[in-house]
Amino acid sequence: MSLPIIVKWGGQEYSVTTLSEDDTVLDLKQFLKTLTGVLPERQKLLGLKVKGKPAENDVKLGALKLKPNTKIMMMGTREESLEDVLCPPPDNDDVINDFDIEDEVVEVENREENLLKISRRVKEYKVEVLNPPREGKKLLVLDVDYTLFDHRSCAETGVELMRPYLHEFLTSAYEDYDIVIWSATNMKWIEAKMKELGVSTNANYKITFMLDSAAMITVHTPRRGLIDVKPLGVIWGKFSEFYSKKNTIMFDDIGRNFLMNPQNGLKIRPFMKAHLNRDKDKELVKLTQYLKEIAKLDDFLELNHKYWERYLSKKQGQ
C-alpha cells in the first residue's frame, strides 16, 4: 500500500509517493537523497518517532502510523562547501518585496471590516496557554523566520541556523516581558522549530503561548491588494486584563505584518545566510538593551520603534 509523504527542507516541499508501509526509514532517506542531494547519514527527520524515541533506519514506515500526506521536516546539509550549501531566497521573497507601510496605515488600521475580522479571531481562535500570563509584565511578540531563525539556509541542525544570542536575549527579556511566538506558518512547524532551537524547553525562560497563521487576518490595501497581517488586537482581545497597546512590542522582519498596529511594531533586520553571518550578527544584543530600557516606561505609545537605535544610543549616553 502506497504511503504518500511530504517532506519540507530548505524552504521547499518534496512529495514522496513511491514508498509503501513495508519500506523503511532508510528507504525514505535514500529517496530523499535523490531529491535533495543530502546523504542519508546527514539527514535528520523531525517527527518520526516510535514509542517517543526517534525512529531508527530499520524501522518500517508502517510502524510509524503515519497518515497519508503527513508533513515531515528534514534537517541536513549537502556535501558542498558552506557557500554552496546556502540556499538564497528566491527573487519574490517576502523580505525583498516588503514595502513601506506608513502611507496605508491610516486607511487599514481602523477600517470596520478589519476590526470585525479581529473580533472573529478573538472569539474563534483557540490559544493554548503554555505558561500563564504574569501580573505586571509587558508583552514581547516574536516572529520566527528570519527573526530568530534562518529558515532558508541548510544545516544539519536547527541550532546552526539560530540567530546568535537568542537564548541570552530571551532570558533577559523574560525578566520584564511575557514572551509570545507568532509565525505565519502552521503550529506543527512552529512547535518543531521551537523544540529544535531549544526554546520550548529552556529552563531560564518560558513561552506564554504561540500563535500560527490561523490567527492572522487578510486586509485589503489600496496599493498592494490583499495581504496577510498579524493583528495584535487578537491578543489584546483575549488577554485584555494583561496586555494592551501600552505594554506590547512585536519584532518582525516584515513591516507589513504591523499594518493593524504600526505603533507597536519594530522591524528587525532579517537574519539570513547563517553560515556567513553567524559571527557578525549582533542584533539581539542591542535589542536586549533596548527592551531593558523601555521596560521602565508605563506607556509604549510614546515611542517610535523605527528609531530604536537612536533612542538606545541617547539613553546609554546619559
UniProtKB/Swiss-Prot annotation:
Keywords: Acetylation, Hydrolase, Magnesium, Metal-binding, Nucleus, Protein phosphatase. It catalyses: O-phospho-L-seryl-[protein] + H2O = L-seryl-[protein] + phosphate; O-phospho-L-threonyl-[protein] + H2O = L-threonyl-[protein] + phosphate. One of its GO terms (cellular component) is nucleus. It is found in: Nucleus. Gene3D superfamilies: HAD superfamily/HAD-like (3.40.50.1000), Phosphatidylinositol 3-kinase Catalytic Subunit, Chain A, domain 1 (3.10.20.90). The keyword Oxidoreductase does not apply. It comes from the Eukaryota. Dephosphorylates 26S nuclear proteasomes, thereby decreasing their proteolytic activity. Recruited to the 19S regulatory particle of the 26S proteasome through its interaction with 19S component PSMD2/RPN1. Once recruited, dephosphorylates 19S component PSMC2/RPT1 which impairs PSMC2 ATPase activity and disrupts 26S proteasome assembly. Has also been reported to stimulate the proteolytic activity of the 26S proteasome. This is Ubiquitin-like domain-containing CTD phosphatase 1.
